[in-house]
């Protein structure tokens, strides 16, 4: 019981030792005894108010948990980067895989820093639209990066050239991912579900998004990039299990 009450908000407080502490406790005890009848009379006269006070006191005694960031044991975090995506998949104590980098370098850098990520085992750019790749420099500056993976459909061409230039400048090897490929990095295992062909209908870059079925710890996540109806139809025909989490544009 003592341990439980010690965990409630305000359950412990500084208290003077020795005679001063004893005198203070005695004074408080006398005050409670002298006001006890007045409190009882007040409760009888205003029962609703008295009940409200009791309920408020009871609620304050419920132990609370302090919210911290990052959450203990986090596995997958979707960064707030505004328009676009940046998903962090944990691979180790201070390492992760970044799937897309959003449009804003400071936003993705801040997200990774708050998660304590100093090493990116890989960066996967699902497709090459600006809202998924323009933040790349913020993710890779000042961090160890193992490899950069992109879709085999290198459109738009200017975004592809921008990504290539950043990779060369930072000495990061670049590869492409297609359906059937697999990534096993630390605590993460991922299977590539798409693209398996170039789809001319709809948005070619969107439908060429790298789709990852990710498992890290006990969490399954399906990261869809920006696939549209045509690629989604192909994906549904090939999907074999339901993930715990689905990320979609």
Across the structure, where does each feature detected by a protein language model lie?
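Non-globular, low-confidence helical/coil segments that flank catalytic cores
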Residues: 2-249
